[in-house]
Amino acid sequence: MTENKISSASDTITMYCTQPDLVWDIVDKDGVNYVKQAYITKKYQDTAWVFDTAYKFFRQEAVKIIPKPQEAESPIWMYRDKKWAVPNAGCRRMHLEIPKDELILFDRRTWNKILNMEYVGTDEEIAAFEQEYKRQGVRDPLDIMKSSFYPLLAQKIKKSWQHLFTDPLPEETYWQGAVWYLKKDWVVEEE
């Protein structure tokens, strides 16, 4: 597995993260915060299976890059470009300086494809996969992941998700990052 690392003189990378006020209050009070999987299931309800599937893949691969603390059940997402970290009501955006050895970087566009349960690859690979599933009578590719009728196709989709960790990093505006926890020491300022 190729790690998406960058080189620079600094030991940290500037990132932006939006979280509910409660999370930042915990970080401020306790110095650290970890995400619980139950929060994700509660937040997404009917579509939780999509997030469970994508997050499970991410966790399984991310621990190969940065070991996961026992307290962490899910990663925390952040962005290099603050325009992607838009706070909703009851949330705050923080400017963070994350140590490079704590941060996994990847292309946010690829991650969005994974969250949509899509096949990831070159245009040619995607076209070939589309032909394959259409030959098998699949009209909506989401059905591949929703049902248990297409295990080989689902396996191919999940295998294609490796691109998240093996493709070179794109231009910085598309960098997304993940950490296993948020630390008070990383907060530079509230935006």
Language-model features: locations:
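Short, well-structured hydrophobic secondary-structure segments
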Residues: V50-K83
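Conserved NAD+-utilizing ADP-ribose enzyme module
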Residues: K5-I13, Q19-W49, A72-S74, W84-R93, ...
